[in-house]
Curated annotation (Swiss-Prot):
Signal sequence segment: none
Positions in the Mitochondrial matrix compartment: 1-14
One cellular-component annotation, GO: mitochondrial inner membrane
Organism of provenance: Arabidopsis thaliana
Main location: mitochondrion
Classification via SMART domains: PHB
InterPro entries recorded: Band_7, Band_7/SPFH_dom_sf, Prohibitin
Mitochondrial intermembrane side: 38-278
Stated family: Belongs to the prohibitin family.
Membrane topology recorded in Swiss-Prot or TrEMBL: Single-pass type II membrane protein
Gene from which this protein is expressed: PHB7
Assembly description: Component of a prohibitin multimeric complex in mitochondrial membranes.
Protein name in UniProt: Prohibitin-7, mitochondrial
Its job: Prohibitin probably acts as a holdase/unfoldase for the stabilization of newly synthesized mitochondrial proteins.
Compartments, record wording: Mitochondrion inner membrane
Length: 278
């Protein structure tokens, strides 16, 4: 049997070497790319190893290395984020209260490995709803509905203290805690509105009474002044006849000024002007 020898293709060894080099280069680039990861600003990273589990080290912002196929980077956002929770509960005097709480929450950066082991990456959804609702119900139940309004700042401080302490037990930091909503049942709201209207009417009535009292005092003072003036005039007339003449002259002057401004001409004698010769 005759076997024909396949002729060598010119350049085949070079092409084969080029292919091998390309494969090796591609694998090298893949390994390099897989062994690097970036941590953006405001984030932190922890690394999970398939053999040893979560490492205790927390990686800051920047580029870091890991073992491809054996290690995986887990990124956490450590910036403060708002979270709002509304709860319906009852006050000490059995009034229905709807209260809303807003918190700025973030994970404690140096506790990320423990957070991942116990809560995972969605730590906020696992912890915050329960501790906020329990705290709101416990604190609101200590106050009457009216005190929740008048002592709102004290209520807010107490809620902030309890929620912050409970969140810290789960390695969660709260940068701000504030009451955003406070509503009551329909009956209590109507009672408050009626009370406010009654208070306004009482203030208005008080003002009217005080004004009437002031007017009364003013009238008395004015009457006393007029009586005193009449008394003094009477004494002046009795003691000095010249005072009567002076009053007549003043009256005549006023009459003359009035007539001077009139368009009609009027002739008056001295008796009409209340002036007579002595």
């Amino acid at each position: 049997m005759n076997v024909k020898k396949v002729p060598n293709v010119p350049g085949s060894p070079a092409l084969s070497a080029l292919l091998k080099l390309g494969v090796i280069g591609g694998l090298g680039l893949y390994c390099i790319g897989s062994s690097m990861y970036n941590v953006d600003g405001g984030h932190r990273a922890i690394v999970f190893n398939r053999f040893t589990g979560i490492k205790d080290r927390v990686y800051p912002e920047g580029t870091h290395f890991k073992i491809p196929l054996f290690e995986r980077a887990i990124i956490y956002d450590v910036r403060s984020r708002p979270y709002v929770e509304n709860s319906q509960t009852g006050s000490n005097d059995l009034q229905t209260v709807t209260i809303g709480l807003r918190v700025l929450t973030r994970p404690m950066g140096d506790r990320l490995p423990e957070i991942y082991r116990t809560l995972g990456q969605n730590y906020g959804e696992r912890v915050l709803p329960s501790i906020i609702n329990e705290t709101l119900k416990a604190v609101v139940a200590q106050y009457n509905a009216s005190h929740l309004i008048t002592q709102r700042e004290a209520v807010s401080r107490e809620i902030r203290k309890i929620v912050t302490e409970r969140a810290a037990k789960f390695n969660i930091a709260l940068d701000d805690v504030s009451i955003t909503n406070l509503k009551f049942g329909k009956e209590f709201t109507e009672a408050i509105e009626k009370k406010q209207v009654a208070a306004q009417e009482a203030e208005r009535a008080k003002f009217i009474v005080e004004k009437a009292e002031q007017d009364k005092k003013s009238a008395i003072i004015r009457a006393q002044g007029e009586a005193k003036s009449a008394q003094l005039i009477g004494q002046a007339i009795a003691n000095n006849e010249a005072f009567i003449t002076l009053r007549k002259i003043e009256a005549a002057r006023e009459i003359a000024q009035t007539i001077a401004k009139s368009a009609n001409k009027v002739y008056l004698n001295s008796s009409d002007l209340l002036i007579s010769k002595q």
